[in-house]
C-alpha cells in the first residue's frame, strides 16, 4: 500500500463510516494505556485487506508521547481536536530514528505513513478523535521492517467498558455525519 492507496482507503472508510458504526457488533475495542497518549480504539475491517480504527486520544505532554514505527502502512484523519506530531526516520532497521519534522495537525488533517522505517508520535493538545486505516502488517523478517515495530497483541490490554463504548460510538456517530474541515 503506497501513500495514494492509503489515502484512497481512508476516503472510502470515511464515506462508509455512518453505515459501519450502525453495526456495533462488528467492532472490537481496546484501551491502550501502557504508553501515552492513552488511546481508546474500536476497530473493524472495511474489506479483507483494510482495517478501520476509531481512536480517542487523551491529552499528554510532548515528552510523554511514545515515538514508534507502525507495523503496517496506514492513513489517518483528525475528526476533532489537534495534536503535535513528531516524525522520524531510521536509516536501517536497527537504528533509532533521526528527527525529520514536527507538525501541528488540526481537525480535518489527513496524512499517510507507508514507509516502514518512519516513526511518529502524537501529543494531543486537546482530546482528539481520529480515523485510521491500515493495510496488512509488514512481515517482521524482511530487510526493510524495523525490528522495534510492535503491535498491541499479547500485552494484556483490556476492552472498553459498555459505557465507554456507548460514549465512543456516540461521538463518532456525530462526527461521521459532517464534512472534514479540509475537504
Description of each model-found segment:
Residues 159-182:
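A conserved mid-domain beta-alpha-beta active-site/ligand-binding segment of alpha/beta enzyme cores
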Residues 142-159, 164:
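Mixed-charge (acidic/basic) macromolecular-recognition segments
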Residues 53-70, 105-106, 115-116:
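Conserved short histidine dyad/triad with adjacent acidic residue
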Residues 89-124:
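Short acidic-glycine-tyrosine-enriched beta hairpin
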Residues 75, 121, 125-142:
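A short hydrophobic beta-strand segment most commonly corresponding to one strand
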Residues 48-51, 59-62, 82-84:
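Short, charged/polar surface micro-motifs in flexible loops or helix N-caps
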Residues 69-85:
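Short, conserved beta-strand element in jelly-roll/cupin
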Residues 1-52, 95:
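A short, N-terminal "cap"/entry segment at the start of jelly-roll beta-barrel domains
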